[in-house]
Amino acid sequence: MRRLALALALPLALLAAPLARAQGGPLEITVAGAELEPMPIAVPEIAPADPTLGALAADIRRVVVADLERSGLFRLVDPAAYIERGIAFDSVPSYADWRAIGADALLTARLMPAAEGRLQLQFRLFDALGQSQLLGRQLVGDGEDWRRIAHKAADAVYTQLTGEGPYFDSSIVFVDETGPKGERVKRLAIMDQDGANLRYLPSAEGLVLTPRISPDNARVLYISYDSGQPEIVLQDIRTGQRERLGNFPGMSFAPRFSPDGEEVVLSLSLEGNTDLYAMRLDDRRLRRLTRSPAIDTAASYSPDGRSLVFESDRGGSQQLYVMPAAGGPARRISFGRGRYGAPVWSPRGDLIAFTKILGG
């Protein structure tokens, strides 16, 4: 039987009086064959410092629990089984009581009013097996952003217990198509990663394709056909302000943000060639990356921003290639029958997802 040990950092800034902690070993998730056993975690009700915050505290807990359970790595311990109830946020939990009901981890929190009508969520994460506090944080935000506060809290727990990067506080941007056949309307839309908070963004009047969101969830890139040919548009999500990215004589398409959000890789069709270019967003400086009579497009950055994977027919058929993000020789990585395209690097950088077309 393999065991996957999850690294647990030492406690961060404690929110209350100093606590006595014991050094414990890492929490473990047991992997039997191909099946992952979710980590049991207890999440008592969030204590509202003001009775008027009771409903909102329950909503925040619901989102946190849903995020953790949806990841497939955590299992919520049934609150009906709790031995210790009404645990004070500033107190040390009775670790034995939580271990007795099978909880490996315990998350406690309280919701408080903050200055200027804002909210403050304080939370602490405990290792019930190692009898220690693993994490203590506070988040402050506007009342209407309570879902984002919940997602950020879930992100902190997820990263602390798995060592993986957070993703709950992220958004999905897409093209929404509605209306009867023959009168379909396409609109640029955005929603939280859990499908909530759907809203439509003001966009170009014509066809909109392939939207990409920036790493900080503040801007979006997409292809607009307002001028009759594909052009890349950069839009601020909050203000709706739009601008065309560059003024090129040919077609521009397939944009994607760099991991730091400071650069965009794109394809430009100039003088009969379609090559990859990188553009700095601060000064709009353009840098050519490939020089090939083939079609080079659909580039995606590696998580560290040092490499690019893209599709090209330079070898006679549509295949995948990897090259340095600063430019340089490209190495083919796909072989065999079919056409390979639309590559995207995984967040950890160990895998590349792509499409493969066989036959027609």
In which residue ranges do the predicted regions lie?
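Hydrophobic beta-strand positions that form the internal "hydrophobic ladder"
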Residues: 172, 220-221, 261-265, 305-309, ...
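Amphipathic beta-strand/beta-sheet edge segments enriched in Tyr/Trp
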Residues: 89-156
